[in-house]
Amino acid sequence: MRIVTDNKIVGFTAGNFDLLHPGYIYTFETAKQHCDWFVVFLQKDPSLHRKSKYKPVIPLYERYKTLMSIQHIDEVFIYQTEEELLNLISIIKPDVRILGEDYLGKSFTGDDLPIEVIYTTRSHGWSTTKIKDLITKQTIEQNPNILNDGEEI
């Protein structure tokens, strides 16, 4: 089963897409250059299964709505576990997967499937984790008592 006719090239990427930034837009633009129909698999909360990941700040529905408003994205499907992601991949039957170049040489869900992988550049320097860390740092610097419930240090 495919979501579009068989004469279209279907591409996809997956992630939680919290705090949408220009780096994501560059990725989506690049993805659309390699496929006719671009699908985003939106993960609910990666922190539930990987403690190294932050819990999303933006609620799921708002992330979904934001992604659906981007002209390069044709469809968004929601998943939580890597098993659910594999099931979505088997249902959609994509031709192309879009991954950041930071995945070069690393294993990832579905890396054993016969799907072409296009690696996109991360040279733009944007990162949700870096943005969250910067916001935290600036908040603490500008409000030094925030962690002490307002008591002077």
Predicted feature locations:
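Nucleotidyltransferase catalytic core that binds NTPs
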Residues: 1-153
